[in-house]
Structures are given as C-alpha cells and as structure tokens.
Regions:
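N-terminal metal-binding scaffold of metallo-dependent hydrolase/deaminase domains
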Residues: 1-47, 211-214
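Divalent metal-coordination and catalytic microenvironments
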Residues: 10, 28, 33, 58, ...
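C-terminal cap of metal-dependent C-N hydrolases
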Residues: 14, 198-241
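Short loop/helix-cap segments at secondary-structure boundaries that form the rim of catalytic
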Residues: 41-49, 107-110, 123-124, 134-138
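Hydrophobic faces of well-ordered beta-strands that scaffold small-molecule active sites
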Residues: 64-70, 100-102, 114-120, 126-129, ...
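Active-site loop-helix segments enriched in His/Asp/Glu that coordinate
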Residues: 79-123
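His/Asp/Glu-enriched, well-ordered alpha-helical/loop segment
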Residues: 135-206
Length: 241
C-alpha cells in the first residue's frame, strides 16, 4: 500500500493526540481517507507514481475544526431555512470547520467536503460561544462553538473568539486547540476524527503560519492555505488523489 497524498516539509504538525505531540519539519501520509503515517522520519517509502505531494514549507498543519452547537435558522419558512442554513454551513466550511453537530435533524448531511451530524448527547464541558461565557465561567476545559443560530449571532469562524481567549485571557495553546478539535470529537463520540493519528480520518488544515501561536495572535487575515477532507484536497482547488 502506498500513499495517495503526502504533505511534506511541515514546519509545525500539531497532532492533538492524547499527549498533544507536536512535530517540527514533519510529514503526514494518507491513503485515500485515512492517515497511514506521520512524523519526522523518511516518507519516501510511501511514494509511487500516483502519489500527490504537497509542500507545506513554513506552514502549520492541524486537524480540521469541529463545531458542536450549530442551531441554524428556525424562525423563517422551511425553504428559506434550507437555503440560509446551507449558506451558513458553506461559510463555516471556508473557515476550516469541516465537521458540525446540531440537535436539528433536518440539518443532517454528509458530503465530500463537510459532515453535519445530529448531536445525540449533551456536553459535560461548558460550550463557549462568546467572550462573556468564558468571563463568567473561567473553565479549565471547554469546547468552542460559533453558536450560529442564537439570537443576534451570525458567527462563521472561531478566529475572533480564539484571538480573545489566547491574548486577553491567556488560555494556553493546548487547551484552546483541543477545544475545537480533539475535545469535541471525544465528547460526542467522533472517534474517527479530531486528531492526526494513524488510522484516523484525513481531515486536515494547512495554515499559512509557522506555529499556532502565530495563528491565535492574528486577526483579520485569512490564514487557511489548504483544506483536506477525507484525504482529498478541495481548497483552494480540488486535487484528485
């Protein structure tokens, strides 16, 4: 078995595994929708003539984001709900949120570039949607959500809230990154995603920054260079693997 996709020369690879392993100058290899290898050793054994290779020199690689509390539009006609919800989900996808959980069954869908699942349980951790939520609770562990669909809330990205939590409230990097990747995956039974490990889904973001500290210290500039869902790069353009 050879890799269908390899990302090489990664400046910082945040796996979000149980030990929060971070590799420098690393690679990640995927076979179709699954990760088959990653680390700092030689990746050439995984390459054949059909392998697509992406160069992430100077860039950061992390698991794709997960939002566990999408409510969507409810106080409009059904046809308008479907249209507006699809538009909102697309906007969230462009900001790296490739898995979404909702308690609204009508929103459920699974497609090549984004999964929307029905949330079947409540979170044992606080869900932080606004600065005020964190200010009031000051939790040690939490899950971040855009809170889309709440009254007067049309937020499509984690970037603004994560900037505030990292820079104003001094939330440590591991807690913050896990709150939008591995912790929601673990909490809601999404055992196939949320971290970059062997046999996990290849849902991956490549960011135009050398470290996640740079990402959380930046606001107002798009930083996602590439997005990969189920091992297929689809943003900024499709690459067949």
């Amino acid at each position: 078995m050879k890799a269908t996709l390899i990302i090489k020369n990664i400046e910082s690879l945040y796996t979000c595994d149980k030990d929060f392993t971070v590799y420098k100058h690393a690679f990640i290899a995927c076979h179709h929708d699954k990760i088959i290898d990653l680390g700092v050793h030689d990746y050439k054994k995984w390459i054949d003539s059909a392998t697509r290779v992406l160069d992430a020199c100077g860039e950061t690689v992390i698991p794709a984001f997960i939002d566990c509390n999408f409510e969507g539009f409810s106080k409009v006609r059904l046809g308008d709900q479907l249209r507006e919800n699809n538009s909102a989900l697309y906007a969230m996808k462009t900001n790296g949120i490739l898995t979404i959980l909702s308690d609204k069954k009508r929103i459920q869908k699974k497609e090549l570039t984004q999964d929307v699942f029905v949330r079947k349980q409540e979170s044992k951790y606080p869900i932080i949607e606004r600065e005020q939520d964190f200010h009031e609770l000051k939790p040690q562990k939490f899950i971040v959500s855009c809170g889309f669909g709440k009254p007067n809330s049309y937020v499509y990205s984690f970037q603004h809230l994560s900037y505030i939590l990292f820079n104003m409230y001094k939330v440590d990097l591991r807690t913050l990154l896990e709150s939008m990747t591995s912790l929601p995956a673990k909490t809601f039974g999404l055992s196939d995603r949320g971290s970059l490990e062997k046999d996990k889904l290849a849902d991956i973001l490549i960011l135009q920054v050398p470290t996640m500290e740079h990402y959380y210290q930046t606001l107002g500039r798009p930083l996602i260079h590439r997005m990969i869902k189920n091992g297929i790069p689809f943003y900024p353009n499709w690459i067949v693997c």
